[in-house]
Curated annotation (Swiss-Prot):
One of its GO terms (molecular function) is ATP binding. Transmembrane segments: none annotated. GTP binds at residues 58-61. It comes from the Bacteria. The keyword GTP-binding applies. This is Nucleotide-binding protein Teth39_0666. The lineage of its organism: Bacteria, Bacillati, Bacillota, Clostridia, Thermoanaerobacterales.
Length: 284
C-alpha cells in the first residue's frame, strides 16, 4: 500500500500534482480534511481493490494543524506507512501565478499577496520539515512536475508519458466501459473443460502452462505485445495519459487472466508503467 499526502504552498501546484498522481494509477482525493485521515487509512489499508492513494491537503487553517499531527500519529501507531510531498515555489513565481489567475491569496487579509505567502511559509514550516520529498515548482512545467513525481513513485523508472492499465474480464459479465482496446481470447482452448483446471485461475501455474502450451497463444501474445509497443507513442502524441487494455474470455478466470498476466510482464520488462487487475476473477 502506498499512501501519499500532497501539501505545500498555495499556488505551488498541488492540483497539478494530484492530476499527475492520478495518471500514475493513484486513487486521488483533493482538499481532504486531515481529521478524516485515520478512517480513510483504515478503509484503504484493508481494501484489496486500492493499493495507491494520494491525498491533497490544505493545512493553512489553525485546527488543521492539530488534526494533521494527531492523524499522522495514528498512522504511525498502526504501522500505516505514509509519505509526505511538499510543494513550494519562489515568492516571485507565486506572486506571478496569483496575478495571472486574479485570485486572492487565502492568507492575505489586506490583499497583499506577498504578505499571505510569508504567513503561509511560517505556518507550513513544521510540516515541511517532516516531508519525505520537497519539490520546488518555480521552473517546472506540468509535464516536468509529473516527471519529478514519477521519479519518486514509479520505483525509479522513467515515466514515458502514459500509464497502461491491463484488465482481464469475462464476456458473460459485460465488456468494460472504460476500455480503449478490447481483445477477445476465446479462440484459445478453454481450461474450463479440464476438470482439474476448472476451479483454478490464470494466476495458477497449471492453468498458465495449459494456455501457453498452444502455438496460437504464443503467437498471439507476441503479436499483441508488438502492436501495443507500436501504438503507445502515437497515443502519447495525442495527449493520452492512460491506456486501458481489456482482455476477455468467457468467464474472466482462465484464458484472459493468463494472457493479461503475460502482457503485463512483457510491458514491465519494456520499462513501461503498467497496472494489472482481474475484474471478474472472483465471479461465479
Amino acid at each position: 500500500m502506498r499512501f501519499v499526502i500532497i501539501t505545500g504552498l498555495s499556488g505551488a501546484g498541488k492540483t497539478q500534482a494530484l492530476k499527475a498522481m492520478e495518471d500514475m494509477g493513484f486513487f486521488c482525493i483533493d482538499n481532504f480534511p486531515p481529521a478524516l485521515l485515520p478512517k480513510l487509512a483504515d478503509l484503504f489499508y484493508h481494501s484489496k481493490n486500492v493499493d495507491k492513494v494520494a491525498l491533497g491537503m490544505d493545512l493553512r487553517g489553525g485546527q488543521f494543524f492539530e488534526d494533521i499531527y494527531s492523524s499522522l500519529e495514528f498512522l504511525k501507531k498502526n504501522n500505516y506507512d505514509y509519505e509526505i510531498v511538499f510543494l513550494e515555489a519562489s515568492d516571485e513565481v507565486l506572486i506571478k501565478r496569483f496575478k495571472e489567475t486574479r485570485r486572492k491569496h487565502p492568507l492575505s487579509e489586506e490583499g497583499r499577496i506577498v504578505d499571505g505567502i510569508n504567513e503561509e511559509r511560517k505556518r507550513l514550516a513544521e510540516i515541511r520539515k517532516i516531508a519525505n520529498s520537497i519539490i520546488d515548482t518555480s521552473n517546472l512545467t506540468s509535464s516536468q512536475l509529473k516527471e519529478e513525481l514519477s521519479n519518486i513513485f514509479l520505483k525509479g523508472k522513467k515515466f514515458k508519458g502514459i500509464i497502461i492499465d491491463i484488465m482481464s474480464f469475462g464476456y458473460k459479465y459485460g465488456i468494460p466501459l472504460d476500455a480503449d482496446l478490447v481483445f477477445d481470447v476465446r479462440f484459445l482452448p478453454n481450461p474450463f473443460y479440464i476438470e482439474e483446471l476448472r476451479p483454478l485461475t490464470g494466476n495458477d501455474d497449471k492453468v498458465k502452462e495449459y494456455v501457453m502450451k498452444w502455438e496460437e497463444a504464443k503467437e498471439f501474445l507476441k503479436k499483441l505485445g508488438d502492436m501495443i509497443k507500436f501504438l503507445i507513442p502515437y497515443y502519447i502524441r495525442e495527449g493520452k495519459s492512460q491506456l486501458v487494455i481489456a482482455i476477455g474470455c468467457t468467464g474472466g478466470k482462465h484464458r484472459s487472466v493468463t494472457i493479461a498476466n503475460a502482457l503485463y510482464e512483457f510491458l514491465k520488462k519494456e520499462d513501461y508503467s503498467v497496472i494489472l487487475h482481474h475484474r471478474d476473477i472472483g465471479e461465479e
